[in-house]
Amino acid sequence: MVESYDAVVIGGGPAGSTVATALARASRHVLVLEKEKFPRFHVGESLLPFSLPIFERLGVAEKIRAAGFQKKFGAFFWNDVTGSGTRPVLFSDALDDGHPMAYQVKRAEFDHLLVPRWREFESQR
């Protein structure tokens, strides 16, 4: 018997896991295709405050807070050509979204928090 799906998501990283969770939460039958074996090393560990409301909607914000990732309150930009940098830019000064900080995450641990979430909803189908 061939199983059918409402959606096939290519990639199980943060974007793929987020889409899969949103779809599964809406009672869609989801298949996630990922060629890599988890946990895995991957770049992309610097989150921005805009991502925090998404994690709240997905129901993983508390798990992310509890994981103990480094809090990040802003950024500093460096120019290798001129050898100079900017003054620190605080998220609370630059963004007006009610989230003055974000996290610097270890991707293998971060992915491990996200991937099981869509499976939880999928298993409730």
Predicted regions: what they are:
Residues 11-13, 35, 107:
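Glycine-rich Rossmann-fold phosphate-binding loop(s) that bind the pyrophosphate
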Residues 28, 60, 123:
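Short phosphate-binding/catalytic loops that engage adenosine nucleotides
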Residues 1-15, 31:
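Beta1/beta-strand and adjacent pyrophosphate-binding region of the FAD-binding site
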Residues 4, 77-125:
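Conserved N-terminal helical subregion
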Residues 15, 19, 38:
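Conserved Rossmann-like nucleotide-cofactor binding loop
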Residues 40-82:
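N-terminal FAD cofactor-binding segment of flavoenzymes
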